[in-house]
Amino acid sequence: MTTKTDFHAIQELREKYAPKVRGIVSGEEAKTIYEVLEIDKRNNIELQNIRDMVVMIYGQWFDKSRDQYLEDKKKGVQAVDKSAEYLDAMSAITCVIDHEKFKRGMGV
């Protein structure tokens, strides 16, 4: 049984985790993801639910960040597009979850 809602776990993870290298999840990063999302405490359905929520919420954060960047650029404001960081994080998080699903014999 988990100690927090999926949404709160994802918010906490957003504060504690950002990929250090694109396309690579270090052991330390995987441990952070595993612990914050309480992956070991989830049954198979809860594991799929948190994965779906990660994709949905990080996708929304990506869209919002990208829209803000484009709006700032249109206004002539010097801005850096950080939206891809959300996609990198989402990919890393789903990789860790999918690895757990695979270990449990679930479809990935």
PLM region spans:
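N-terminal compositionally biased, intrinsically disordered segments and leader/signal-like regions
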Residues: 3-6, 33, 95
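Alpha-helical oligomerization interfaces
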Residues: 28, 32, 39-41, 46, ...
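A structural signal for well-ordered alpha-helices, especially hydrophobic packing surfaces
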Residues: 58, 94-97, 101
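Amphipathic alpha-helical oligomerization segments
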Residues: 8-20, 40-81
